[in-house]
Amino acid sequence: MKETCTVCMHRCRLKPGQFGRCGARKNVNGMIVCENYGRITALALDPIEKKPLSMFYPGSVILSVGSFGCNLHCPFCQNHDISMKNADEAETVFLAPEKLALKASELRARGNIGVAYTYNEPLTGYEYVRDAAKIVKQYGMKNVLVTNGAFSEAVEESLLPYIDAMNVDLKGIREDYYRKLGRSEERRVGKEC
C-alpha cells in the first residue's frame, strides 16, 4: 500500500520498499522511515562564515555534519557526490545524536560554538537534526541549519525551537526555475513554508 511522505512539497507517494525523490526517506512496511538517521557522510570543523553566516559569532568555528539525500536536484550542487546518493549507495558512518553533541562539546577548546547541519539537505532526515539539536542545546551550544527551505510546516514546528541560526540557500526567484530543479507546486510550498 502506498504511503505519503509529508516532509517536503513533493508529497511522495511511496510503495513498500520505494525511496522518495530525496533518496533518504523510504516506505518500510507501510511507514515512511528516515533512512539517513545518524548515517554521516561528512564531518568537519568549519569557519562559521562558510555556512555562510558572517554576522553570527564571526570568527568562530562550528562542527559541520551532513548525510545523504536532497529534495532538489541542482546541476550546480557542490556536494552532489554525497547529497544525490540514496541509502543503498552512500558511504556512511553511524554517529548517534548523543555522540555528535559530545564531539561538539569536546571541540570547544578549538573555538567550536556548536553544530551546523549542512552539506546535503539536512531536513530529509529532520528527525536526526531534531534529536541532536536538543542535546546540543543541553550542552549550551548553538545549532545552525543550512537548508534549501523546502520543508513542511510540521517539520519547521518540530525543529525551530532548537535552531539558533539558519541559512536558507535560495537557488533562484522564479517558479519556473525551481521546477527545473525538481521543486514542484512552488506556490503551495512558498505559502506553506
Where are these regions (language model features)?
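A short acidic, helix-capping loop that chelates divalent metal ions and anchors anionic groups
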Residues: 85-86, 174-180
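Charged helix-capping and loop-helix junction motifs
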Residues: 130, 184-185
